[in-house]
């Protein structure tokens, strides 16, 4: 029995790029909705509040989470598209590396591109996804910083 990775070894470059696009966007969609679920009062109180102990997030906050949160938002939402869509081994490694390092940047103030997530850690009800496009679609985007002076970003 072949695996989804073995089935994808001979994909064309264009088809591989299409798969990368799908995997990233489906992962982001899963993450967005699992993250919104984690903000339902019961889930927030018993699961996600651990992650939000960092009002001023630092890189390690990306991994500082309850095990249920890790399974739903950080693992399940990222692995499922690989299993369903499949891709070659090298693309999978590259996406796994990117999926591991980008959340660390999202939790730092060093890169202006990732500032939207700082708003999430201040106000809790905005900016649930990566890149902001799903937040814009679903009405949860807030592009301003709640306390930009504190983060030295104004």
How would you label these PLM feature ranges?
Residues 17, 21, 33-34, 64-65, ...:
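Hydrophobic alpha-helical transmembrane segments of multi-pass membrane proteins
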Residues 8-9, 41-154:
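Cytosolic/stromal cytosol-facing helical appendages immediately following the last transmembrane segment
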Residues 1-27:
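Juxtamembrane helix-loop-helix connectors linking adjacent transmembrane helices
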């Amino acid at each position: 029995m072949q695996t989804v990775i073995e089935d994808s070894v001979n994909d064309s470059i264009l088809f591989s790029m299409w798969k990368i696009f799908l995997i990233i966007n489906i992962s982001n969609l899963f993450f967005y909705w699992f993250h919104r679920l984690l903000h339902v009062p019961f889930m927030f109180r018993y699961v996600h509040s651990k992650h939000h102990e960092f009002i001023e997030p630092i890189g390690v906050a990306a991994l500082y989470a309850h095990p249920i949160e890790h399974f739903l938002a950080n693992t399940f939402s990222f692995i499922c598209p690989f299993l369903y869509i499949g891709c070659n081994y090298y693309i999978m490694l590259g996406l796994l590396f990117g999926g591991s390092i980008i959340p660390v940047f999202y939790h730092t103030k060093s890169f202006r591109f990732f500032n939207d997530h700082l708003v999430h850690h201040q106000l809790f009800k905005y900016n649930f996804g990566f890149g902001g496009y799903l937040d814009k679609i679903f009405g949860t985007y807030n592009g301003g910083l709640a306390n930009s002076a504190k983060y030295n970003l104004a």
